[in-house]
Amino acid sequence: MFETILIANRGEIACRVIKTCRRLGIRTVAVYSDADAGALHVEMADEAVRIGPPPAAESYLNIEAIVEACRRTGARAVHPGYGFLSERAAFARALEAAGITFIGPPVAAIEAMGDKIESKRLARAAGVSTVPGTLDSIADPDEARRIAREIGYPVMIKASAGGGGKGMRIARDERELLEGIARARSEARSAFGDDRVFLEKFVEEPRHIEIQVLGDRHGNIVHLGERECSIQRRHQKVIEEAPSPFLDKATRKAMGEQAVALARAVGYHSAGTVEFIVDRHRNFYFLEMNTRLQVEHPVTELVTGLDLVELMIRVAAGEPLPFRQEDVRLEGWAIEARVYAEDPGRGFLPSVGRVVRYREPHGKDIRVDSGVVEGAEVSIHYDPMIAKLCARGHDRRAAIARAREALDAFLIRGPAHNLSFLSAVLAHPRFQEGRLSTGFIAEEFGERFRGAGLPPERLEEIAGVTVRLRLDRARREARASGKLPGWRYRPERDWVVQLDGVCFAVTLLADEDERSVLHIVDRHLEVAVDWRPGDPVVRARVTGSTFTLQVDPLPEGWIVRHGGAELRALVRTRRAAELAARIPEKVRADAGKMLRSPMPGLILSIAVQPGDEVKAGQDLCVLEAMKMENVLKAEQDGRVEEVRVRPRDTVAADQVLITFA
């Protein structure tokens, strides 16, 4: 076994690997860029080495610096995590040349599977089902048109060296084909230094289902079942689960056998994932093989009871797998939700900034993998994922319920985040029924998230909770010293709660230290809360139901977050509500007269010029930030007055890019 392992990564995956190494008694070395000098993975490791400035190309992708860090610290093995250098054959080869063990597959397997075109050839040769399409990169637009006509629209444009959703586009006609190839090549060139793209038939209503494989250096290869990864946005996975609610035993067995056959064909050892797309008839087609640990590996760990990182380390040390295929058992159900620093209300644009408050949910069968602590900075330079929240249940319904409750209790303040959006996805009837496809988010939520709806009964209960909070606050204030002699607390009887414009008349029937009895609409509610002033997380008990919500104070109430909804709750006495109704509301300033940059980044292109008439939703410019090309669109119809930036300009967060007349 290794004495010291260097983790060539950052964030939650570096922390995840360190935890397993600690349990195994292995010393760990972290590497970090200047932007990550105070990061959690640096703090957790036994030793840390600076490898360069913030840009990944000068730090986490710097092979020479990482090999030198191994030499300096005596690390005889490297775990690459995922992303960065994890699938770079040149990195594995450099470690091998330095006498350092790469905790991953052999170089030949990385090379074979790293090229999407070559991997498809190998898959066909190994008897794996593949999607109709070309096996060669596209030479020119004429060839692209010809191939698309042969296999039929829609087609998928894919970067040969691609991954993580980058360099991928769907084209439904010739115009989209030519535009998509140009955009995919640009994105692939920027992300991978390789602008080759190829075409394949796009499967309508596809599911994205992958098989986890694991092999040792002694020729033993097994699969650990599947993961359902169909909930995606712009080809990036958002929610994953194991097992899939769609597969039957026969399809699961066939997919597992083909995944193992492909792994065996390339002499694979370590952990890897064979990805398939599956149509509505359970026909499945090879997509790609990821020769590394996947982001979503925890759901497999939760249903198998295995530690994949430990097994990778033991395999790299030459140990055989301690079990065979017939020993693999899948028990229960697990769901993972990726928590991103992004703004769902602004087209899911990445968000940056300091994490002002951070507290993870805890409880039975809840797991959070994170590289963030309170006070950490979400940087422009790296992927905006904050954490992965995982929940396990005895069945799918129980796992979903546990995940929803945990999301409600997950406290994050600072950068914008997608917790409410994740809750809304899990609550959606179509998700709960398991009717999934990779188009689910686009079909059900569109390009921006405007909050989930809540049933009337839950709104009534939330109204009751906000009144109880108001009474609790008044009761605490009454206990403060310095009150006038003879003054004592007398709770108001009649209240009006306004939840985003919907008014509830609330009558206080009884008020005690532990609970309040309220009449709302036609219900008598017994309300109790577990809450400390200053803490946004509230545990509420309302006449037989228990739920969690978060509150942030307003002058006359709270911003309430629960179940994917964000509500403005104004809590007034009946008299105050009557007076407020007579006061005219202030007219808000028109913020639609300018387009501001949502984050620091680089302007790649501008699609408009002064005098142009634009429609709501029209593309205005492309901003490169956090490893992605983000298309900024018009909020409303209007006419361009001034364009204040040019392509290749570096812009700051909130900088005005375009103004409108």
Residue ranges and their predicted role:
Residues 259, 298-526, 619, 653-659:
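Catalytic cores of soluble metabolic enzymes centered on carboxylation/carboxyl-transfer
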Residues 392-398, 403-413, 584-598, 602, ...:
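Conserved bacterial/organellar gene-expression machines centered on ribosome-associated P-loop NTPases
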Residues 307, 510-537, 541-548, 556:
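Conserved nucleotide-binding/hydrolysis modules and their immediate coupling elements
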Residues 586-661:
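Structured functional modules or segments
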Residues 1-274, 278-297:
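N-terminal beta-alpha lobe that positions the nucleotide/phosphoryl donor
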Residues 173, 215-220, 279-282, 362, ...:
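Short acidic-glycine loop/turn motifs at beta-strand connectors
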